[in-house]
Amino acid sequence: MIKEFRDLIDSMIPVGKVVKPHGLRGEVKMKSLTNQLKVFETLKKVLLYDEKAGTVVRAEIDTIRRAGKGYIVHFKGFKSVEAAERIRGFYVYAPLNVLPPLKEGEYYFYQLLDCEVYDPEGEYIGKVTDIIETGANDVIVVTKELPDFTVEEELIPVIKDYIVEFRFKDKKIVAKRLEYLTLEGKEDNDDENQRIDDIS
């Protein structure tokens, strides 16, 4: 059963996440996990997956409409707020074959998520845990757990000035760190004001 599920998931990608119920008729608010929004124009049959419990639900989209940066979705058979509440936090998986082809230099969000990020010298920066859409360009959120169990977070714009190479098959990204992060900790405190002037 587990192998069958893994084989099934391998042929699908997460395109959304159920945030919360919407209204009283079984609709839900869904956060998009893909920057290729055309996928939602024809998307019908999906898998709903709860990572914590390992629960999988086959579902079919009845209606979907844009709402701000997310979507309002109604799955067939969901007729109440209680039914919608049961899938809160579930990921929405779509078949790979419904995705539109990519142009050179384009990517899907799922390709970035969980990638390990290294600087050009091979130093480990962290793992991609989220993606921020700014309008002008995407920004990856890179987090790293430190020895004292605190978490260090860096933001890296997905533009050619910072991204050196994508290695999606290896789930790796080579990227330059932001200038202020590179300088941090490498200058004496006496030079603090000079560093701020240089960056601004």
UniProtKB/Swiss-Prot annotation:
Assembly and partners are described as: Binds ribosomal protein uS19.
Q: Which Gene3D superfamilies match?
A: PRC-barrel domain, RimM
Keyword set for this entry?
A: Chaperone, Cytoplasm, Ribosome biogenesis, rRNA processing
Which Gene Ontology molecular function entries are recorded, alphabetically? Answer: ribosome binding
Q: Where is the PRC barrel domain?
A: 103-181
An example Pfam family from this entry, by short name, is PRC
Q: Which NCBIfam families match?
A: 16S_RimM
One cellular component (GO) term of this entry: ribosome
Provide the species name: Kosmotoga olearia (strain ATCC BAA-1733 / DSM 21960 / TBF 19.5.1)
SS bond partners: none
Among InterPro entries, the record links this protein to: PRC-brl_dom (IPR027275), PRC_barrel-like_sf (IPR011033), RimM (IPR011961), RimM_N (IPR002676), RimM_N_sf (IPR036976), Transl_B-barrel_sf (IPR009000)
What does this protein's UniProt record list under function? An accessory protein needed during the final step in the assembly of 30S ribosomal subunit, possibly for assembly of the head region. Essential for efficient processing of 16S rRNA. May be needed both before and after RbfA during the maturation of 16S rRNA. It has affinity for free ribosomal 30S subunits but not for 70S ribosomes.
Name recorded for this polypeptide: Ribosome maturation factor RimM
The places in or outside the cell where this protein is found are:
Cytoplasm
Q: Does the keyword Transcription apply?
A: no
Coarsely, its chief localization is cytoplasm
For this chain, the family text in UniProt reads: Belongs to the RimM family.
A GO BP entry is: rRNA processing
Taxonomy, superkingdom: Bacteria
